[in-house]
Amino acid sequence: MEPKLRIIRKKKSEAENAHLDPLMRALKALHSAGAPESMTAEELERQRRSQEVLGKLTAPMTGMDYEEFALSGMSAAWTRLKAPHGSRHAILYCHGGGYTSGNLGYSRVLSSKLAHATGYDVLSFEYRLAPEFPYPAAVEDALRAWDYLMLQGYGARDIVLAGDSAGGNLALVLCNRLKTAGRKLPGTLILMSPWTDMTMSGQSYTERAEIDPMLTPEYIEAVRLAYAAGRDYRSSDLSPVSYTHLTLPTNPRV
């Protein structure tokens, strides 16, 4: 049985779109401070600080327990509801950040929201970041986090695998690695704006430039070079959009 794919779409009213324009401009100005055209050490540090600022714009929800621990040498954290729910399901959350930024502090906002929305325990982890640790370091770390859940007694079908942006890419690549190894896949995928194509061949960079303040061609080029310089961006471990063998449901929940 293949994992369930959940697609969430929300149409905005004209009033919401009108309000969104100044917000998008503000976000673009903030993000530009952390979206280097080249990946020097100074610019990379600036990008990571910017990512932390963006993550802290929304404080974690109350009613949560947050437990940090070491997972096979990397930092990880459980986010749980204070009120027990008794479920044996868990969410493995892969954070975004272009594979070059993001940490447990950044992850905490979305992991809290996922725990609150589902009632499930959420495991987040700090995978190694590029360019210090390029591909496949993040994939190896995601596999370690998956194996940790298996050792804790969770079944593959009990796991919801979630990821946003580069974390969505990582979630899909993890599924592909599990499938290739003949292992069971997670029961559900939750992908939020997943980065599925590193070839930069789509038209959305120009067609949606005014409403996407974050993902400029300069930013994408910088982070993909940091993560996988010299590699074939069409490969399945970099561009999951190329998958032909990882079959997802034909009737996903919307």
Located regions from the model:
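Internal hydrophobic scaffold segments of catalytic domains
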Residues: I7-I8, P194, P252-R253
